[in-house]
């Protein structure tokens, strides 16, 4: 198949493009770095001419933006544009990249919606479900915390945290005992291609990995690289720091290192089903080579 990949030059998107090529498909990246913007429905429609399917991995992944509506325009409006274009061109399949943060954490029945990213990914999941109910050929993938080698972007949280720790720039961990689902980036990409080829329209597939404490990568570094464990930041101290960082960001236009909403996310466990591929130890070794 010829497949348009939104966000195709990003951390996950570029890995999806490679996975598509490896399976004999033709990947067509659509990304802002190459002149594509999911907010531009006309541009998206032009790019979709002649393709068989869309994998929609583009998203605004950030802890904060001065203009909160950017999250709505990209994360919710972008998905709606993809669905409209898929219907216009009568495409065979849409595979949508959601997020574990769009779902409820362990012990809750509703999504947390702590920050604008989480809020809009939860809203977009509702859009995806409604589209599926209306007959759209959409399959939704819900990855865990994606990690692995590659771009040090907002989407590569673990890679950035590990790099910061090794460089002495990581202040500490908030909620180190809380469970995350560490999902290897290549496995998540393969899950998208599986959904493209074999997924049932309307399905929501958890592409989880290893359900481990947040501190797990740093314990591996301690055992295999001899680094110290990061210190634990109490929730109250992290919340105060988050408020100070938000104030600084609003005054300077910079990006906060932490926000109170991020601290709230770190208070919860985020396990997923669907543990896929390889051992955590092997994956950490490859990521830190």
Q: How would you label these PLM feature ranges?
A:
Residues 70-76, 113-125, 151, 155-159, ...:
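Short-chain dehydrogenase/reductase
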Residues 161-183, 187:
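A conserved pocket-lining segment of Rossmann-fold NAD(P)-dependent short-chain dehydrogenase/reductase
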Residues 3-23:
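N-terminal Rossmann NAD(P)H-binding glycine-rich loop of SDR-like oxidoreductase domains
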Residues 191-254, 280-289:
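Mid/C-terminal beta-alpha module of Rossmann-like enzyme folds, strongest
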Residues 126-149:
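Conserved beta-loop-beta element that borders a ligand/cofactor-binding pocket
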Residues 63, 99-107, 146-150, 155:
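Conserved catalytic-site region of short-chain dehydrogenase/reductase
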Residues 81-120, 139:
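Conserved Rossmann-fold NAD(P)-dependent oxidoreductase catalytic core, especially the SDR/UDP-sugar
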Residues 36-77, 81, 85, 102-107:
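NAD(P)H-binding glycine-rich loop region in Rossmannoid oxidoreductase-like domains
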């Amino acid at each position: 198949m010829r497949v348009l990949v939104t966000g195709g030059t990003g951390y996950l998107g570029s890995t999806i493009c490679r996975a598509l090529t490896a399976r004999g498909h033709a990947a067509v990246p659509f990304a802002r770095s190459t002149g594509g913007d999911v907010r531009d429905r006309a541009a998206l429609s032009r790019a979709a001419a002649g393709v068989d399917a869309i994998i929609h991995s583009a998203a605004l992944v950030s802890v904060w933006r001065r203009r909160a509506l950017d999250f709505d325009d990209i994360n919710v409006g972008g998905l709606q544009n993809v669905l409209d274009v898929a219907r216009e061109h009568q495409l065979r399949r849409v595979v949508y990249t959601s997020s574990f943060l769009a779902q409820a954490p362990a012990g809750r029945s509703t999504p947390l919606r702590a920050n604008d990213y989480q809020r809009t990914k939860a809203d977009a999941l509702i859009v995806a479900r409604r589209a599926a109910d209306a007959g759209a050929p959409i399959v939704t993938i819900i990855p865990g915390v994606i990690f692995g080698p590659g771009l040090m972007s907002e989407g590569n949280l673990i890679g950035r945290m590990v790099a910061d720790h090794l460089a002495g720039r990581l202040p500490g961990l908030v909620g180190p005992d809380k469970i995350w689902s560490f999902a290897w980036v290549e496995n998540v990409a393969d899950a998208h291609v599986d959904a493209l080829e074999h997924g049932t329209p309307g399905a929501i597939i958890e592409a989880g990995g290893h359900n481990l404490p947040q501190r797990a990568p740093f314990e591996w570094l301690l055992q295999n690289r001899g680094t110290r464990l990061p210190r634990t930041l109490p929730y109250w101290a992290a919340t105060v720091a988050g408020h100070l960082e938000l104030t600084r960001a609003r005054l300077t236009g910079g990006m906060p290192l932490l926000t109170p909403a991020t601290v709230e996310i770190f208070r919860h466990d985020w396990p997923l089903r669907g543990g896929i591929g390889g051992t955590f130890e092997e994956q950490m070794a490859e990521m830190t080579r």
